[in-house]
Every structure is written in structure tokens, then in C-alpha cells.
């Protein structure tokens, strides 16, 4: 059985957002992102699959950009959807722990600056 406790084993990094793979199968992956205040998971998109984020601890902002930027606050208990092919980013206001589930392979493209 695959299982993970993302709260007991917090893995923050000072220089960047830390992405830790928790569980992976042929069709699905679950990762956890550990953010220090001010860290950003920059705009990117997944052309082959939706991505769902679940907030465990902390505060931040989740933004989508599909021609018009829309942002929503993140706090414990919140879940948000990044639809297939839509640019999305996360900004941490405080230490933030967010897990995500995505189909595999979903592909990944960074947004040009």
C-alpha cells in the first residue's frame, strides 16, 4: 500500500519551492509543495490533464490565467482545480503546504516571461 503523511515530514527549502513526490502510479501522481513565505510556483500549464490542489497548512494565493487572470485565496481545507491547458501559479503569503494530484502523463509547459 502506498501512503504518505505530508504534515509530519515537512520539507521546506530556503532557496525555492520544494516539490516532493509522495505517490506515483502509471496513471496518477500525487506531489506535495512546501513553500516558505514569498516563494512562488510560477505560471505553468499541463496540456494533457487537469490538476487538483489541496491546501493542508498556511496561506497563499492561487491564480489562473486563461486570457484573464483570476486569483483566489488559499487556506487550510481549500481545494482548487487547474484545468487542462490553463496557466496557473501559487504564491505563498506564509509557510504553505499544498498537495496535488495529476493524471500521468500530463505534460508541463512554463509560461514565457
Q: Residue locations for each model-derived region?
A:
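Short acidic-glycine-tyrosine-enriched beta hairpin
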Residues: 68-84
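Short hydrophobic/aromatic-rich beta-strand segments that constitute the beta-sheet cores
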Residues: 32, 62-64, 98-100
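Conserved short histidine dyad/triad with adjacent acidic residue
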Residues: 31-47
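A short, N-terminal "cap"/entry segment at the start of jelly-roll beta-barrel domains
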Residues: 1-31, 42, 75, 111-113
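Short, conserved beta-strand element in jelly-roll/cupin
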Residues: 35, 47-62
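Ligand-binding loop in jelly-roll beta-barrel domains
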Residues: 75, 84-109
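Short beta-strand segments in beta-sandwich/barrel cores
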Residues: 40-42, 58-63, 79
